[in-house]
Amino acid sequence: MKCVHQNDRIVKMSELNLTKKKLLIRVDLNVPLSEGKISSDKRIRAILPALKLGIENKCSIILISHMGRPKEGQFDKQYSLKPVAEYITQLIQKEVRFISEWADGFDLIEGEIVLLENIRFSEGEKDNSDNLSKKLADLCDIFVMDAFGSAHRKHASTYGVIEFSET
């Protein structure tokens, strides 16, 4: 994995050779739901430029996000990202495979887009555990931080994953 900085400047995705790379993109899909339906897709639409760039470069894309404030380490259906995966699939006209259990690994097909279950269901997210951070870092070639609203949090998916990347 690469965390790319040049002269104290963060490099944009468009400046990298992304061709056929595995991208782990931390996005903000903490969208409002009403009766299981997305009531505002503003945050989903905000990830489209990064998705488009990844698709154009034949990347395999792994999306991670949180939704709400579930009890860490416990599944709670009301905070599941499954409806979001279905929504993105319709929006971009390309399947976004939803993966509920990913911590022990999963197969990723070249060019595929996957959305992992709510990262806050994972033990160690809020505590920035080294174990979870390493698991996330091991998923990809390049980590992309595209969740501005969560960037200030010192969590495994926003901070720790970067510590375990190559510089």
Stretches with model-predicted labels:
Residues 1-167:
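Active-site loop-to-helix "anion-binding N-cap" substructures in soluble metabolic enzymes
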